[in-house]
């Protein structure tokens, strides 16, 4: 068996060690054909089929590893990336990196929340109030943009308890369903930042073989994401209804038209649609004369 630790010049990728983002990254790499030998007890993993090394770290360490050129690529939430960037710029440090693409997972929002019984109309109601947060720089930027002075209270966890504990009047924290806020007697009042995961690269040029591998990975990621947003549609259509049926299909440009072996009045139509095909549209297609309608998922795409 080949010893992967002896391979030189591997592409180094930093990923979050635990949590939902870690799971989504593992799924994405698998979909891109990267075979990783994962071991939960080890902080470094290796690809079996490509010269790739995975560093499994805390999510808030990933931006710094990219900024400092320690790793070549990283997948990180945009909220964590921008918070770290703003913090470094506030300290007059130079920050350089390349953002290659946004990914289709890691959705979250950074929101302001207050006690459910508080009267709130807009952000100016928080003037001179104390706000607890784990994202002081994103919060400060938002409040400055709105011309509101406030007092920041930095908490690295359990931010939701701050109002009930008398630590702060309001909080600024990540929200998904809002269930945690509700459980702590809070209500979401303003979204200040929306985030997804993104793929970033260190600013320093990579050697040609590494950059070629980055380009290959990026192409595969884009193909996986495009496929996830697309459907392959097959149907039979009367020749005289082709124009009408094509107009009903969302996101379709040039369908493939094929003759049917034993039917000269109809043809087979194959199309890739980059929009969802709802039941209502399928019913409209049937009313227009289409039959044998199949809608299939697409695993991979390359244009």
UniProtKB/Swiss-Prot annotation:
Location(s) in or outside the cell: Cytoplasm
Q: List the cysteine pairs that form cystine.
A: none
GO MF annotation: an example: ATP phosphoribosyltransferase activity
The protein's superkingdom reads Bacteria
Question: How is this protein activated or inhibited?
Answer: Feedback inhibited by histidine.
Q: Name one GO biological process term.
A: L-histidine biosynthetic process
Output the SUPFAM superfamilies linked to this UniProt entry: GlnB-like (SSF54913), Periplasmic binding protein-like II (SSF53850)
Q: Which family is annotated?
A: Belongs to the ATP phosphoribosyltransferase family. Long subfamily.
The protein's name is ATP phosphoribosyltransferase
Q: From which organism does this entry originate?
A: Haemophilus influenzae (strain PittGG)
Q: Which gene is the coding source of this polypeptide chain? A: hisG
